[in-house]
Every structure is written in structure tokens, then in C-alpha cells.
């Protein structure tokens, strides 16, 4: 059996899948906040419980909300303080007596979508999350491409370019600080949070993404103008990403992926930001939603 974990700041979810990635069992618990040992204990206990339930020694894949250094096995997960900068893979492997694999949650999301029957026709699937943050996962022929140390796909930490700053207005463009230590990272603009901050700073009113989108569909001029600007900002940024990576398909996840107008507007806005000979990839909504993380974590053992 394939065990997939979605490790979050507030909850830890285990889902058990068969080798066809069909879910057999799920359990969620609160994320311990008191100590690293307690955090490890919770994961070990969930694995041992699943082993007993399914009378097997299942494979263990982790989806983590941060960067996993594949050279050192250290995970940088700042929103889970007790496990940040710890040798998670080594410690869990020793405790469980088996190999443990881990990737960041964006890679797991992308891997889950790449293993969907409809997407297996595409050699290169790019998954993009437009949620609390903006991140990416690169899947080549059904396998995560994580680069030299595991940093490939950290697209949220690319920075706004000349055309994006010109679009926002040289004298009024809001420049946001990013948690990575840099400024003007895509994570702070193309995420759901960035969508809201841009509206506030450019239009002078604090609204939720849901409220902005509702006003857009109600033909509110301010919201319509803002969405047009946001689509153009996305097209500029995705144009750079597509030029560099040339994916066959882009799958969008996260809260903003439910804004259906994106799938109509982005393919029309992209060509002017690409080379003449470039091909606009298929852009589609994620199929597995909140289940993508655990499903992709489980699929780590189908791909290496």
C-alpha cells in the first residue's frame, strides 16, 4: 500500500492508496506544536496504525509545506516550528525501518495531477498553485524534477520583471516583501493573498478574493478593470515561465484556480508575451483539489 501524508501547520493527514492510486483510508490529526519528538511520534503512530489495519508495511511519502534539501535531508518548513531545519527523512526512516520520501506540497500536487489518466498523455506537466502562496511543481514523464538539491519549481520566488512593473505603474507599483528575504517575488502577487493585496493597494478598498470575483461577475467597473490587470500580470509572468520551461500542460490549483474566467482569458493574453514560434500550453483546472497533496505524496513511490 502507498501512504501519503499532507503535513500542514494545523493538521497532519494520512491517506492510504492502492497501486492504482485509489484511496482506501484517511485519518487526520492536529499537528503537534510542543516538540520535534512529539511531531515524529504522531507520524510514526499513524504509519503503524495503517500497517496494522492493512497487514502490510506501506511506503511512506510526505508532502511538506516548504523546501526539502535532497542533499542533506533537511526540511525548511518555517510554519511548523518544531520540525523546521530538522533531518526529517533520516529520523523517520530510522524510526519506521523503511525508506521515506518527501517533496514540497506543490510538487506533490503536480505529481498527483500528472498521474491522472487524462494528463498521462503529456510528457511535461507544470503544476501551479494560486492559493495562500504561488508555487510550482515540474513533472517530467511522471516523475518529479526537483533539481540539484530540491529547489526546482520554486517559481513563486522569481521576481517581477520590467513589463510587470511597467504594467503596475512605475510610480505607484506596490513592492511587497517576501518571506524568503527578497522583494517583489511572484508569490506576493499571483497568490490569492497577492490578488487581495493588489486590489487593496491599487483600488483603495480591502476585499476578499471572493468579493472581488463576485463584483467582477456583476460587471462592477473597478473589479473588471482590476481583473484585466491581474490577468495581464499573470500572462507576463507565465510568459517568462513558459519560455523557460515549455510545458505541454499547466494545471492550476489553489483557491484562485476556481476563478473560471482565468481559463478563458489567460490563453488569449499569453501569445504577446511569448516568442512567435512558441505554443501556448493547455491550461486546465486541477482535478483532485485538496486531495492532491496526499495523492501526490503517495505517488512518490510510483515514480523512482
Swiss-Prot record:
Single biological process term from Gene Ontology: peptidoglycan turnover
The family this protein is said to belong to: Belongs to the ROK (NagC/XylR) family. NagK subfamily.
Name of the protein this chain belongs to: N-acetyl-D-glucosamine kinase
Keywords of this entry: ATP-binding, Carbohydrate metabolism, Kinase, Metal-binding, Nucleotide-binding, Transferase, Zinc
Pathway linked to the protein: Cell wall biogenesis; peptidoglycan recycling
Record GO terms (molecular function): ATP binding; N-acetylglucosamine kinase activity; zinc ion binding
UniProt xrefs under Gene3D superfamilies: 3.30.420.40
Binding, ATP: 4-11, 133-140
PANTHER family given in the database record: N-ACETYL-D-GLUCOSAMINE KINASE (PTHR18964:SF162), ROK (REPRESSOR, ORF, KINASE) FAMILY (PTHR18964)
